[in-house]
From Swiss-Prot:
Positions that bind Mg(2+) 2: D115, D118, E280
Source species: Vibrio cholerae serotype O1 (strain ATCC 39541 / Classical Ogawa 395 / O395)
InterPro entries, A to Z: FBPase_C_dom, FBPase_class-1, FBPase_N, FBPtase, Fructose_bisphosphatase_AS
Presence of keyword Lipid metabolism: no
Protein name: Fructose-1,6-bisphosphatase class 1
GO biological process: fructose 1,6-bisphosphate metabolic process; fructose 6-phosphate metabolic process; fructose metabolic process; gluconeogenesis; sucrose biosynthetic process
Amino acid sequence: MQKMRTLGEFIVEKQHDFPHASGELSSLLASIRLAAKIVNREINKAGLADIIGASGNDNIQGEEQQKLDLYANEKFKAALEARDQVCGVASEEEDEAVAFNKELNKNAKYVVLMDPLDGSSNIDVNVSVGTIFSIYRRVSPVGTPPTQEDFLQPGNKQVAAGYVIYGSSTMLVYTTGNGVNGFTYDPSLGTFYLSHENMRIPENGKIYSINEGNYIRFPTGVKKYIKFCQENVPEDGRPYTSRYIGSLVADFHRNLLKGGIYLYPSTQSHPNGKLRLLYECNPMAFLIEQAGGLASDGVHRIMDIKPTELHQRVPFFVGSKNMVHKVEEFLETYPD
């Protein structure tokens, strides 16, 4: 029987894949692993503790912050600061980027951008939620505080990205630009084990994931694509199946494994889309491309978009390569 590899062992094995390998990125990923375990523990007992429901505060996007959002945000910040590999973080839950002021942190080479708890409004109904993270090498001089430019880098500059999905089992999925690998958490041992090696998304899928309750507000091209998905064309594998959980990590994870497309287009009320380029779209785009899929805003490759602000939003289409190409065709054919 083949020995099961832990996340820690796998990271060490793959360390030579990292440019300028020095062990720092390995240690940074270990910090994320630790914070994920802590957050997973709290999520699993959320119904028994006073940490579900809203905190009474809004984040910078004007969205009501959930108590676990804030808890996860603090735990990930603390874990990342403690190891001295990160000079600062930008979080969906913070108005501005946070610089770590310890001298060792100023000498760190990396910044982290994160959505500490995606889909947190679903916790009280026991739906899967997740953490999304993105890692960049800083562009400002080492030894100085991080600058805005360190965080406003296009997705094609990411050195690592991933997510943790807290569901029926907890998984950590990540890439460093050399494929995508998934690790399942064994709570009895407190260890992540390699369970999904070299994950690949099928070029064609049969699942489309979109909140069809907003159909009337969608661009014409997206409406036409939805009708295309629903057409009865058995020789082409249609109609496709509609599956939408409302938690990006959960919808993305299913489509990565099964093949499919996730769509969050612009609407009349959100002309730039609703998902955040830096905290959600870029890391998911890096993962999907490494798994053989595509991510687009309907016109441009997501990872080629140059960010102009920390909380920038974009339309988002991500998943199986041929499905993303098809929705781009509809958007080009039916411009609004």
